[in-house]
Swiss-Prot record:
Location within or outside the cell: Cell membrane
Keywords carried by this UniProt record: Cell membrane, Membrane, Transmembrane, Transmembrane helix
Organism: Streptomyces coelicolor (strain ATCC BAA-471 / A3(2) / M145)
Gene name, Swiss-Prot/TrEMBL: actII-3
Name this polypeptide is given: Putative membrane protein ActII-3
A Pfam family hit: MMPL
Length: 711
């Protein structure tokens, strides 16, 4: 039944209905896709779970200050010392700031530093419905006010949370277009080289492009109506994932369609057979990726939780497009779209000895030596993963270049306490206000505690830290404050503020890693076990996935520490890398191992493994190059976290497709033999040949390897 349904999109009449349906969807949903940026939530506090202590403080603080405000710090500096004219300028600016875009309340300052070389003014800005785009507008207004009339030699910088948000928004302002363009160029280049046709690449790209637009529209609707958390990072990941995964599915389908065109004169019949034979593996792999992504719904961190449905939507829409729209387009355009190498009915491709035939011969000679050596080499690189610093990036280390907000913070910390402008906030019972105030003065790292405010039975206390709000020292102060205040009977004190938000995000990331990684491994194992009806093969494949993941982290640590000179990685980085590498690695596992199992049923496991490798090696490599290329496009973006993610996933995918899947897994299968399929009946069937020597490889293996390589 399923195979029959898969063959319908390429039918003589249905192909036009399929095309019309997709065009109709595009017309209806394209306007919504352009609104995705309107529902992005780029405020870190919004990513926290509702039960986080800092989230509770944010909600309770609305009794004492306007909700959804962001502090802006304007710092003035003169190395030789602030002059009277400088101070007059700062006071005049503060008056103008009060009338600026989104400003709430009166500016605080200017305050002179103890060394007399800097001034600081703090202005609160309302986030509004535009989020960080609104903060960008406010920051631009303040810069326009402060800079033009500044006395010669006086430096003026806008920093603090608003400054950082403005610089982040500026970084992303043209990033969507740039990322899409770079990704498309990478995919087109790989497709042209793979197909060796100036025309064929257009059809997968049209299908993938429509998939992206429709995915963005669906994600917009989910974010607007179902509370899905979407930020700029997940929106960009959606772009590269849809274009990469959809193109992977296209490569597999087109390869099988080309093969069937040589066997069937009628292109509709050829497409029906191609869909019946290649479709189940493609559907199974896409469904596995989607289910793996949906495991992220278990995450405590809303930004991570939102990533799962976003990616699942992208993968499933990409699958639907490549199983319906692409087949319709291919049969509409006919054989000529393969020009100049059109597959002719009744012909066979030139038989030459290809790369994967040679690799199969190498692996089959000494399979145990191959998989042991490969595992040891990968394991050696994997040990470098312990040097990866994934304790979290400070804001100042989050940019590949140094924007104004970073420069301003560096100046601020030279002349003022680093935590000024972003205080620790404590909410407690009003009757305990004095106790809380006294207790905060004993907390390590706290240099100043403001007088308590009491309202509606609650006390509000601000404490200034000597360290930067997202520094390790500030994290220790948050922990110490919570431990100290917990000892106050009846105070019910809760600690919030910028430092606590960062602290709680890192705690949530750590919790998510401990829960989600084992669950994903269990889910993937169950899916592979059901698909292969075996237990040994899934266990070995899971082990190879874990090895591939740690090897990718090891290479990432090597490059981050010694080549790119990054300060570290975000606390969510290991989990995101794991999810993508495992979910996408399952794709290639399914493509390879299902073909090995299919051939093993005819030839025995040893010969089936060799034929499976030579049959799929070329297309898996091309698919890996496409996906690695699309994720590598993320490395062109200006933010460190997204660049690190793109680099590591790209490296991991290349490792997975070229070494782990194609060499290690094949060698393991040869060595383990028929027991790979235990307890499936194949495990009890003797191989036709127990000797996988090169001379014993059937001619069909070499022939198909050559066919694959020639494509």
């Amino acid at each position: 039944m399923t195979r029959t349904l898969l063959s319908w999109p390429g039918g003589r009449r249905l192909k036009w209905l399929v095309l019309a349906a997709w065009i109709g969807l595009l017309i209806v949903l394209q306007p919504l896709a352009g609104k995705l940026g309107d529902v992005e939530s780029n405020d870190a506090a919004a990513w926290l779970p509702g039960n986080a202590e800092s989230t509770e403080v944010l909600e309770l603080s609305e009794k004492f200050q306007p909700a959804d405000t962001s502090p802006t710090v304007i710092v003035y500096d003169r190395p030789s010392g602030i002059t009277a004219a400088d101070e007059a300028k700062a006071r005049a600016d503060a008056t103008h700031f009060a009338d600026g875009t989104g400003v709430v309340g009166e500016p605080y300052g200017p305050v002179r530093s103890d060394d007399g070389k800097a001034l600081r003014t703090v202005v609160n800005v309302h986030l509004g419905k535009d989020g960080w785009e609104g903060l960008n507008a406010a920051a631009k207004d303040m810069r326009a006010i402060a800079r033009p009339s500044a006395p010669d030699g006086l430096g003026v910088h806008v920093t603090g949370p608003t400054g950082y948000a403005a610089d982040s928004a500026e970084s992303f302002s043209s990033a969507d277009f740039k990322l899409t363009l770079v990704t498309l160029l990478i995919v087109v280049t790989i497709l042209v080289v793979t197909y060796r046709s100036p025309l064929l690449w257009l059809l997968p790209m049209i299908s993938a492009g429509m998939s992206l637009v429709i995915s963005q529209a669906i994600v917009y609707l989910l974010a607007k109506n179902a509370g899905l958390t979407v930020n700029a990072q997940t929106a960009m990941i959606l772009t590269v994932l849809v274009l990469g995964a959809a193109t992977d599915y296209a490569l597999l389908l087109v390869a099988r369609y080309r093969e069937e065109l040589r066997r069937h004169e009628d292109r509709h019949e050829a497409m029906a057979v191609a869909l019946r034979r290649a479709g189940p593996a493609i559907v199974a792999s896409a469904a596995t990726v989607a289910v793996s992504m949906l495991v992220l719904l278990l995450a405590a961190l809303n930004s991570t939780k939102g990533l799962g449905p976003v990616c699942a939507v992208g993968v499933l829409v990409g699958l639907l497009s490549m199983m319906t729209l692409l087949p319709a387009l291919l049969v509409i355009f006919g054989r000529w779209v393969f020009w100049p190498a059109r597959p002719k009915h009744g012909t066979e491709p030139d038989v030459t000895r290809g790369l994967w035939s040679r690799i199969a011969r190498l692996v089959s000679g000494r399979p145990r030596a191959v998989w042991v050596t490969t595992s040891l080499l990968l394991g050696a690189v994997a040990t470098l993963a312990v040097t990866l610093n994934a304790d979290g990036l400070q804001q100042k280390d989050g940019f590949k270049t140094k924007p104004e907000s970073v420069v301003g913070e560096e100046i601020l910390t030279r002349h003022f306490p680093a935590g000024s402008g972003e205080p620790m906030v404590v909410i407690a019972k009003g009757a305990s206000a004095d106790q809380v105030h006294a207790a905060l003065e004993t907390v390590p790292g706290v240099i100043e505690v403001a007088p308590p405010q009491v309202k509606d039975g609650l006390a509000y206390v601000e404490a200034t830290l000597g360290a930067g709000a997202d520094s390790p020292a500030a994290m220790r102060s948050v922990t110490a404050a919570r431990e100290t205040l917990a000892r106050l009977d009846g105070a019910q004190a809760r600690v919030g503020g910028s430092s606590a938000v960062v602290h709680d995000m890192r705690e949530a990331s750590s919790r998510d890693r401990g829960l989600i990684i084992p669950v994903i491994l269990a889910v993937v194992f169950c899916i592979l076990a059901l698909l292969l009806r075996a237990l040994v093969a899934p266990l070995l494949l899971i082990a190879s996935v874990v090895l591939s993941f740690f090897t990718a982290l090891g290479l990432a640590a090597l490059f981050f520490n010694h080549v790119f000179d990054f300060a570290g990685a975000d606390s969510a980085f290991p989990l995101w890398v794991f999810v993508f590498l495992v979910a996408l690695g399952v794709d290639y596992n399914i493509f390879l191992v299902t073909r090995i199992k299919e051939e093993s049923d005819r030839l025995g496991t040893r010969q089936g493994a060799l034929k499976g490798l030579t049959s799929t090696g070329g297309v898996i490599t091309a698919a890996g190059l496409v996906l690695a290329g699309t994720f590598a496009a993320l490395a062109t973006l200006p933010l460190v976290f997204i660049a690190e993610l793109g680099f590591t996933v790209a490296v991991g995918v290349l490792l997975d497709t070229m070494i782990v899947r194609s060499v290690l897994v094949t060698a393991l299968t040869l060595d383990v033999g028929r027991w790979m399929w235990w307890p499936h009946p194949l495990a009890r069937r003797e191989d036709p040949s127990e000797d996988p020597a090169v001379s014993g490889m059937p001619d069909s293996i070499d022939s198909e390897a050559s066919t694959t390589a020639s494509r």
